[in-house]
Amino acid sequence: MASKQTPMMEQYQRVKDQYPDAFLFYRLGDFYEMFNEDAVKGAQLLELTLTSRSKSKDNSIPMCGVPHRAVDNYVDILIDKGYKVAICEQMEDPKTTKGMVKREVTRLVTPGTTMDLAGDAARQNNYLTALKQEQGGYNLAYADLSTGELKVTKVSNEAAAINELVNLQTREVVTEPEVSASLLDQLTKRNILRSTQGQVVNQAEVAYLSQDLTDAGQRDVVALLVSYLLTTQKRSLAHLQRAVAYQLSSFMKIDHRSKVNLELTTNLRSGKRQGTLAWLLDETKTAMGSRLLKQWLDRPLLDQAKIERRYDRVQELLDHYFERQNLQEELIKVYDLERLAGRVAYGSVNGRDLIQLKTSLEQVPKIKYILQTLDVPAFDDLEQALDPLEDVAGLIDRAIAPEPPISVTDGGVIRDGYNHQLDEYRGAMQNGKQWIADLQEQERRATGINNLKIGYNHVFGYYIEVTKANIDKLPADRYERKQTLVNAERFATPELKEKESLILGAQDKSTALEYELFVKVREAVKEQIDRLQKLAANLAALDVIQAFAKVAEDYHFVRPSLNHDHQLQIEDGRHPVVEKFMGHQEYVPNDVLMGGDTSILLITGPNMSGKSTYMRQLALTAVMAQMGCFVPAKRAQLPIFDQIFTRIGAADDLVSGESTFMVEMMEANNALQNATADSLILFDEIGRGTATYDGMALAQAIIEFVHNRVGAKTLFSTHYHELTALEGELDHLQNVHVGATEENGELVFLHKVTPGPADKSYGIHVAKLAGMPTPLLTRANQILTSLEGQETAAVPSRGVEPPAPVIEPTPAKEQTPVKEQTTPLVEESSGQLELFATAPVEKKDGKADKLARQVKNLDLMSMTPMDVMNQVYKWQQNLK
C-alpha cells in the first residue's frame, strides 16, 4: 500500500490538477522541479536525468529539475515542441516562513503567448488566435503578446478561417469548449494547439480593448481572446492596443497553397526563408521593419491611392542616395521598440532593455532631420509623426547605469548620483574596509596599544580585540565588552556600532532601494506605452520603404503604372529571385502582353524551358506592385488584381508525392468558383494527372469556362498541343511558347517567350539531358524518324474534330457575360507534339524492342527530371 503523500507533494498535486495539460515547473529553492508523468516526459524532451524523490519502491516519485537561472531556455524548448508550461513560484521566503511555503502559478507560457523570442523568431510575429462561430461564418481575432498588436475580422466559412490561421502562421487557437469536429480535425492536421476558454473575465479591460468595434460578434471573439490572455498571464495587458477590425476584401486574396507555390515566404525545396520573395525584399534594418514587410507581403493593397503613396516614398528615397544611406545607418541603431514596449508593460524589462530603448530614442531626432532635408511632401506626415520621446530618453539616461547587469534584483542597475540615499549605501559598501582600517589606526594611536585590531564574525559583528595585558590602557567610558577570550577581550565602541549598522545593512538596503527605484522608472516608461507603439509603427513603415528603395536600386526595379481597364503590359519582366540566384549569368527577360482584349495566354514548350518561371514571375510582379514595391521589369503597366489563384506543381526537381489528381481538381475548382474578371489565374499543366483524353477534355473545358464565364487574366501552360487550335475559336485567347533550338545536335533552351504555339517537342533531347544510354537514344531517333514518315501520310489538315455537342458549364456566379464560345472537342490526333509517337513498330530484337516500346510510350513532357532518371536507372539495371 502506498504511503501517504507529504504536505509538499499534496501542494504540488493541488496545483497540478489546475493545469492538467501543461508541464508544471514547481519552484524548490534554486531549482524548478517536475514530478510524476511530467518528470518522465520532461526528462525525455529536455534530455534531463530522471531520478526519484523517494527511494522506496512502494512510493517512488519520478523527478527531474532545471536550475532557476536557466529556466527560460528549457521553457523555450517545450514551447517550440508545442507544449504549455505553468511556472509555479515560491510566494514566501523559505528562510522566514514556518511550515509549508505558499506557492502559486504566476504565468502559463504557451506557444501563442511566449514573449522571449530571439534569433530568426525575433523578426516574426507570434500570433495567438481566437475563433468563435456564428451564423454565417466565424469571427477571428488575433494578438501578438510581444508587440501588443490586436486585430479582428470575419470570415465566411470554416475553410476561410483555416486559410487565415495558416496565413497568420498561428501556433495556438483559443475556442469555446464546444466546437465542430471538423474544425478540431483541421487544427490537428496542421499541428495547431487548441486551447479553450469558457468564462469571460475582466469586463472592464475587454470593454476598453473592443470599444472601437461596432460588430457584436467581433467584440465577443476579442473578449474570448483577451480573457484567455488574462487567465494565463496573470498580469497587466496594458500594452495591448485597442482592437482594429479589418476586412479581407480590402486586400488582395492569395490562399495559402498559392503562397506556397509562389514561394512568397517559404522555399519549396528547403522549407526555409532563403530563396523566397520575402528573403529578396527584406533589406530592413530593424526587426519590427522585417515583421511589417511580411505583413505587407501577406496583404497586398487594393486601394490605388495607398499604393501610389508608397510608390512616392520609395521614389524619393531612390532619388536621394546619400540621405537613404544616412537613414539606414540610423535605423541600424534602433532596437525592437515594439517588443521593448511589450516587456516594459509586461513587467519583464531589465536595465539593458531600457538602455536599448534609450539608444533607439536617441536616433529619432537624427531620422527626423534626414526626412526634413528631403523636403518633399511624401514624408511630411511621417516626419511629423516621429515622436522622439525626449522625456523618456532623459529619464532613462539619468536613472539607469550605462552598462547595467541583466538581473534587476542584484544591484548595479541605477546610475550613480540619481538617488542620494543609494549613493550613501554604495559609499558605505565601497568605503567600509578603508574606514575600518582607518579606525583601527586611530584607536591604536589613542590608546597606545600597537597590537590592537578590529575584526568581524557572524555572531558578534565588528569588534575591537585587545590582549589582556593591555586592558588597563583602554578608557573605561568608550569601550563596551562583547566577548572574553583566553588571552584577549573584544569590545565595541559607539562609532563602530554606528558604522557596523551602515556597512552590514548597506548591501541589502542598496539592493532593495535599487529595485524600488527601477520599478518607478519602469512604471514611468510604461505610462508612455501608447507613444512608444506609435513611434515603433512609424519607424517600421519607414524601414520597409527604405528597403524597397534599396532593392529597387540593387536589382533595377521600376515603378509600375496601375490601371483599371485590365491592361497588362510588362516589358522585359524578370523573376526577381531566379535572377538573383543566377548571379553573373544573364537572365533572359520576357514580355507579358495582355491587352483588354486578351484574357488567356496558352503557353506551350518543352519541360525545363521556363514556363513555370514565366508564370510565377507575373504573379510575383503583381504582388510586389500592390505591396507598394517597384517591380522587376523595364516597363510595367498592371491592373489591380483582387485575387491570385495558382495550380502549379512543385519545383521541377522535387518529387513530393503529394500532388494527386484530386488535389489538382480541387485547386482548379477553387479558382473557377471564386475568381472574378479582376483576378489572376495560373494553371500549370491542368489534366496531366489522369488519362490523356480525360485530361485534354478537362483542360479544354476549363479554358472555355475561364474564357466565357470568368474573364480573369489567365496563364495556362499545357503539353496538350492540340489545345493551341483554340486560338482560332476563342477571341480572348492567345498562344505563346517558350522557345528552344538545336545547335550541333545539342538542345539549347532559349527561355524566351514568343507568340504562337511550340512547333517541336525536343523530347529525345530532354531524355539525353537526363542521361539516358546512347544506344537507347539512337534507337529512339530511328523509331521517331519512322513514325514521322508515317504521320506525314496520316495527318489530317486540322487537329480538331468536327463540331460536337458541348455541355454548357454552370456559371459560378452571375457576372457580366463574355461572348459565349465553344470549340470542338479535341482528339489525340497523330499531329500531337508527343515526346514519342505511339504507332507500333516492327520487332527486330526482343530486349531492344521492348525497351524501345517503353521509351516510345513514356509521356516525358509530363514527367520531372527525377522521374526520368529513376526510369532510366531501372532500364540500366535490366540491360545489365
Swiss-Prot record:
Q: Which family does it belong to?
A: Belongs to the DNA mismatch repair MutS family.
Describe its function. Answer: This protein is involved in the repair of mismatches in DNA. It is possible that it carries out the mismatch recognition step. This protein has a weak ATPase activity.
Please give an example of a GO cellular component term from this record. Answer: cytosol
Q: What is this protein called?
A: DNA mismatch repair protein MutS
A Gene Ontology MF term for this entry?
mismatched DNA binding
Kindly list any coiled-coil regions of this protein: none
Positions contributing to ATP binding: 605-612
Lineage of this protein's species?
Bacteria, Bacillati, Bacillota, Bacilli, Lactobacillales
**Superkingdom of origin organism:** Bacteria
* Gene name, Swiss-Prot/TrEMBL: mutS
Key words, A-Z: ATP-binding, DNA damage, DNA repair, DNA-binding, Nucleotide-binding
SMART domains assigned to the protein according to its UniProt record, in alphabetical order: MUTSac, MUTSd
Which CDD domains does the record match to this protein?
Answer: ABC_MutS1
Q: Where is the composition biased (Polar residues)?
A: 818-829
Listed InterPro entries: DNA_mismatch_repair_MutS, DNA_mismatch_repair_MutS-lik_N, DNA_mismatch_repair_MutS/MSH, DNA_mismatch_repair_MutS_C, DNA_mismatch_repair_MutS_clamp, DNA_mismatch_repair_MutS_core, DNA_mismatch_repair_MutS_N, DNA_mismatch_repair_MutS_sf
